[in-house]
């Protein structure tokens, strides 16, 4: 993806997951080879989402939070206020004839964008082989998860779903699930680590980092 075809960035504000999910699918259904790629920035009310591989028993107690089955990869995760969510609506064939091979590179680019975003706030984080997402790389909470990702890549190379980064959340609902299918996985947010920032600032930073890596 060249700089001239950098994705359009759309701020959708706070929106229910079901509305965004339906909109992503409709956008992808309707897109053509000429449709511009887009990044959608959104904040969701509380919701648990299940990936295609999800075991419903990893939702230990949903309380009154909706549980939504999706068509993304991965297991169960939680979205809620104070979390940056960016969905990537891309056509991987535009610059990569074999979209499936590029999919692995895409995951690396997304993860690196998150790592770079956190580094801007002096938070050292890393990826883990075989466990998509971003984790603290040092300190007493080493291994705690701060960002999750899951994608849907259709046979025509078009993607949707994306990445979530915990900024300043009520983390309690993460204890009601086995996050990403891992029992006992600790989940953390930027605020708990001392980062002084706002949701809007992190949205802007992550969108910029994603655009830069996708254009590289």
Curated annotation (Swiss-Prot):
Q: What is its EC number?
A: 2.3.1.181
Keyword flag Lyase: no
How would you classify this enzyme at the top EC level?
A: transferase
Q: What is its main location?
A: cytoplasm
Its recorded reaction(s) are: octanoyl-[ACP] + L-lysyl-[protein] = N(6)-octanoyl-L-lysyl-[protein] + holo-[ACP] + H(+)
Q: Where is this site: Lowers pKa of active site Cys?
A: 145
Q: In which pathway does it act?
A: Protein modification; protein lipoylation via endogenous pathway; protein N(6)-(lipoyl)lysine from octanoyl-[acyl-carrier-protein]: step 1/2
| GO biological-process terms attached to the record | protein modification process
This chain's protein is named Octanoyltransferase
Query: Which species?
Result: Herminiimonas arsenicoxydans
Source gene?
lipB
